[in-house]
Amino acid sequence: MRVLFLFCSILFLSLRSSAQKPIEYNISFPNAKHHEAEIELLVPDVPAGALNFRMSRSSPGRYATHEFGKNVYGVKAFNGQGKPLELNQIEGDVYQVENHDGTVKISYTIFGNWVDGTYLSIDDSHAHINMPATFMWIPQLQNRPITIRFNNLDIYGWKVATQLKPGSSPDTFTAPDLYYFMDSPVELSAHHLISWTDRNTDKTEQIIRLSAHNSDNKDIVSNFSKKVARMVQESKMVFGELPRFDYGSYTFLHDLGAGNAGDGMEHRNSTVITDNLIAIAGNEPDLLGTFSHEFFHSWNVERIRPKSLEPFDFSHANMSSELWFAEGFTQYYGNLILRRAGFLSDKEYLGVISGILNGVLNSPGAASFSAREMSRRAVFVDAGVSVDRNNYANTFTSYYTYGAFIALGLDLR
């Protein structure tokens, strides 16, 4: 009887946990031309006591600190009856409410005008969303499921491209927990979408998608997708198979524009690739380098992952001694895959190898510091922002180059 009671108690708690109500996000764009979005989150079943909510200071795939809270304003909180709650800002990006009734609704305005893999950008043409740069979250409730609705899509003629799981309507998506939500970038725009099916070595089929927001017509995007598909096949040859992507698909979120930053950012089942070019046409070789690097990350970093990056902490920079492997080996294989796929000539590939060798052998930083030490410097150099001068010319060698140098040496051996 005691064993049966214990079993029933565990089952009850398990079912209760699995039936937790999701945290609901809504994002709207009534003032997109001025780079603003309005965000609401509804938090049901709030535990008794004070509730903290905050913006992130770190983002998956980035290793330095980023002050995402600086672009948040007009923060308000309400209880389940719609009555305002007293709001305390206890840190620059952390807020607290008390005396709630078990439900808390939070609303705020956010500004974003920078297209890359880390930040948020909004205008009449699109909303380019990195989740940690956009959405507040509840530290106490990181395991709750999440739903999100993207409003105003019809007004702007936008579609949704993301690795999030589709929900009950075209503008609604879900995530099983906070980490997957934060690791799922979103492109809202009138983009071209090209999809194809990949048959894995175990005969299972998965969908690979290319979302392209740029000035090219669909034929150009379609032709480019064939090159991307060739790269994907060559990448598969390195490991013998592709990863088993969650929800059966992988998405390249590609965004070109004259004001964009050049960037690539890996995620578990997608990647963001941005550049300040206005078109794919004529720039295919340069773009394929980023595509190859980022897709290789779907194994290396996303599934072959440094223990030092788990669990990922969104509240501060995440330091790792293994980025020479995570990023450096990816750098090496990204270029090797392009050579094997026929996108680089022997001369072009040898130029890449020469750059790797010179980047380490002639670097004062590499002469004084190990690859592990350079990896730990990422918390300062990986798109981190500072205004004072530094001595990086004499003390730093990129862990990308350092790791690629080691990978080359092992391959030659």
Mark where each language-model region is.
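Juxtacatalytic substrate-recognition/specificity segment
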Residues: 197-323
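Acidic/His/Gly-enriched intrinsically disordered linker/tail segments
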Residues: 305-312, 317-400
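Early extracytoplasmic/domain-onset interaction patches
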Residues: 20-58
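Carboxylate/His-rich catalytic cores and anion/metal-binding grooves
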Residues: 170-181, 232, 246-249, 253, ...
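Non-catalytic architectural context of zinc metalloproteases
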Residues: 42, 67-74, 78-231, 238-245, ...
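Short glycine/serine- and small hydrophobic-enriched flexible loop segments
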Residues: 332-339, 405-413
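Active-site-proximal structural scaffolding
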Residues: 34, 68, 141, 224, ...
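Bacterial Sec-dependent N-terminal signal peptides
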Residues: 1-23
